[in-house]
């Protein structure tokens, strides 16, 4: 909670708005839209991969949430406050972070499959910003975000490694 309290102490309305917007890039609809666009415009196989990653990641994430049942930071510590605009979407359990897992799976998958360096760097920037936004907004702990990042990272590596072996 120390990191969350440190971030709480430096919040400003400007950064609240920025990270409230950035965090939406970790929603399920983003991986679905990205998968459809990639399917139509780039590669059917890559589109299928992205859709598979998103759906499998969502199932794994919800399973872990129900298994561990860890409450949100402000539930654990009533003195802690979150950015209010984030409260409406921060429902259910805290661990692991669904937004982080979606962002790493989606943008990590795109980064792993693209040949364009600028696309790769943009994807890495987005997945890092979404992950940080969950901490800044106060809706997840570093453990929630770190485990989600690792789970999605492993999924990206396994899926794209299995393809290389084919």
Write out the residue ranges for each language-model feature.
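Juxtamembrane membrane-interface segments at transmembrane alpha-helix termini
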Residues: 62-69, 133-140, 155-159
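Interfacial helix-loop-helix junctions of multi-pass membrane proteins
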Residues: 73-76, 129-153
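Alpha-helical and His/Cys-centered functional microenvironments
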Residues: 103, 138, 165
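Hydrophobic alpha-helical bundle signature of multipass membrane enzymes
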Residues: 1-94, 100-130
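Short conserved micro-motifs on helix faces and helix-strand junctions that flank
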Residues: 40, 66, 95-96, 135, ...
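Conserved small/polar residues in nucleotide/adenosyl-binding loops
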Residues: 160-166
